C-alpha cells in the first residue's frame, strides 16, 4: 500500500500537467467520468438520513465547492434496485438522480436525456436511505454530455454557454462526440462531463485530454 502523501503528490503532479497542457492549447480539455449519483434537497436529506442530518465530505471534485459524500442510497424502480449510489454535495433546491441508460433497464424506468436541472417530466423512482425513503415522481435523468468552462477559456475558444461543439477523441477507440453543450460561468473549472457508458465507448478515463472543435 502506497502512503497517502505519495498518492496525493502524484495526483497533484498529474493535475498540474493537465492544467499546463490546457493553458498551452485551450482546445484541450480534461475529462470527468460520472457514475450514477444523487443530488439531494434538504427535505429529502432529512427523510433519508434523519432530521438535520448533514453530508460527510469524502472527496473534493474539480468543480469548485462540489464534493462526493460518504453517504449512499439505494434506488428502487419497478424492476429492481441499485444499491450504494453515491450522494454528491452540497445539497440542492431539488433532488436530482443521474443514471445511465443501462441503469434504467435495471430499474425498469426510461429516464430522458437532459441537461442538469431540466427535471420537468423526467422519470421517477424510490430513494431509500438508512432513516427512511422518498418516492420521487420526477427527478431522474440521463445527463447529456457537456463541458464546464472557465470564462477565459470560453473566450479563447470563441464559445459561450449553450453553444454545441464537437469533441475529438484520440486512441484505439477514438472518434468524435457531437452535440456537446458548453456551460460557462465564473464558478466553473474547465472539464468535460460524460457518463460511464460514453467513457467506455471511447476508451476514456478521468483526466484524459480531448480536443474541442467548433461547429
From Swiss-Prot:
Pfam families: PTAC. Zn(2+) 1 binds at residues 37, 39, 98. Its cofactor is Zn(2+). Phosphate binds at residue 92. CoA binds at residues 33-35, 61, 79, 86, 105, 200. It catalyses: propanoyl-CoA + phosphate = propanoyl phosphate + CoA. GO terms for molecular function: acyltransferase activity, transferring groups other than amino-acyl groups; metal ion binding. GO terms for biological process: propanediol catabolic process. Its EC number is 2.3.1.222. There are 2 Zn(2+) ions per monomer; Zn(2+) and CoA bind inbetween the 2 domains in each monomer. Pathway: Polyol metabolism; 1,2-propanediol degradation. Its main location: other. GO terms for cellular component: bacterial microcompartment. Keywords: Acyltransferase, Bacterial microcompartment, Metal-binding, Transferase, Zinc. Formed by 2 beta-barrels, each is capped on both ends by short alpha-helices. Involved in 1,2-propanediol (1,2-PD) utilization within the bacterial microcompartment (BMC) dedicated to 1,2-PD degradation by catalyzing the conversion of propanoyl-CoA to propanoyl-phosphate. Belongs to the PduL family. This is Phosphate propanoyltransferase. The lineage of its organism: Bacteria, Pseudomonadati, Pseudomonadota, Alphaproteobacteria, Rhodobacterales. The gene is pduL.
Amino acid at each position: 500500500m502506497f502512503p497517502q502523501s505519495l498518492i496525493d503528490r502524484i495526483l497533484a503532479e498529474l493535475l498540474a500537467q493537465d492544467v499546463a497542457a490546457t493553458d498551452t492549447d485551450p482546445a484541450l480539455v480534461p475529462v470527468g467520468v460520472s457514475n450514477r449519483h444523487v443530488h439531494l434537497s434538504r427535505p429529502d436529506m432529512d427523510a433519508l438520513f434523519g432530521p438535520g442530518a448533514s453530508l460527510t465530505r469524502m472527496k473534493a471534485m474539480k468543480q469548485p465547492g462540489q464534493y462526493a459524500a460518504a453517504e449512499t442510497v439505494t434506488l428502487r424502480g419497478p424492476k429492481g434496485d441499485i444499491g450504494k449510489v453515491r450522494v454528491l454535495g452540497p445539497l440542492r433546491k431539488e433532488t436530482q438522480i443521474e443514471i445511465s441508460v443501462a441503469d434504467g433497464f435495471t430499474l425498469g424506468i426510461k429516464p430522458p436525456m437532459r441537461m442538469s436541472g431540466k427535471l420537468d417530466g423526467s422519470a421517477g423512482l424510490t430513494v431509500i436511505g438508512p432513516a427512511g425513503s422518498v418516492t420521487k415522481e420526477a427527478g431522474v435523468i440521463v445527463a447529456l454530455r457537456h463541458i464546464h468552462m472557465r470564462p477565459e477559456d470560453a473566450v479563447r475558444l470563441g464559445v459561450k454557454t449553450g453553444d454545441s461543439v464537437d469533441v475529438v477523441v484520440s486512441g484505439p477507440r477514438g472518434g468524435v462526440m457531437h452535440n456537446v453543450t458548453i456551460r460557462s460561468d465564473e464558478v466553473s473549472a474547465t472539464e468535460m462531463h460524460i457518463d460511464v457508458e460514453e467513457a467506455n465507448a471511447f476508451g476514456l478515463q478521468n483526466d484524459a485530454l480531448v480536443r474541442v472543435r467548433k461547429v
